[in-house]
Design a protein with these regions (language model features):
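Aromatic-glycine hotspot motif
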Residues: 2-14, 52, 66, 99-108
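Short beta-edge strand/loop motif at the mouth of beta-sheet-based domains
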Residues: 5-6, 25-60
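Solvent-exposed alpha-helix faces
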Residues: 22-23, 136
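Hydrophobic-ligand binding "helix-grip"
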Residues: 36-37, 56-104, 112
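Generic short beta-strand segments
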Residues: 45-51, 77-81, 110-114
């Protein structure tokens, strides 16, 4: 099964690093999320929306929180991606792990569950190319924002 995994060390505590994926203000500031609905509990919804206009919502990622351990891990199952130019893609899994280090926190992001076919190949390649830039964007954002 194909998966995408990237890690980066961030000079911030684990709880702040994980909050970058759960707090709307952080999501808005580093990832450009325009709307979110997140229930931080097992079985809770995790939904992010980008490119909102008066007529439509551009891109939506949504799933079910399978595990949430503050300052440690966020596991989202049944992750589905909506793109107006593509078929709905899912279900997948997204795992966000934080590991305390002497100099901060290692953030590891793993996205898995990619199927086969042209749209899946397109999405896998987009995500494979995007996550390295995304984790560096998180690092830059968090290391330049106050605790």
């Amino acid at each position: 099964m194909r998966f995408v995994q990237y890690s980066v060390v961030i000079a911030k505590p684990p709880e702040m690093v994980l909050a970058a994926f759960t707090d709307f203000n952080h999501l808005k500031n580093w990832w450009g999320v325009e709307r979110s609905f997140i229930e931080l509990k097992r079985g809770g919804l995790y939904s992010l929306v980008w490119k909102v206009s008066p007529d439509t919502m551009g891109f939506v990622t949504t799933g079910i929180i399978a595990e949430y351990l503050p300052a440690c891990q966020l596991k989202i199952e049944n992750l589905v991606y909506f793109n107006p130019q593509r078929p709905v893609l899912g279900p997948m899994e997204l795992m966000v792990l934080t590991t305390p280090e002497r100099i901060g926190t290692t953030l590891t992001v793993v996205q898995s569950g990619y199927k086969n076919g042209p749209d899946w190949d397109w999405y896998y390649n987009v995500v494979k190319d995007a996550w390295p830039m995304v984790v560096l964007k998180i690092k830059d954002y968090l290391e330049n924002v106050g605790d």
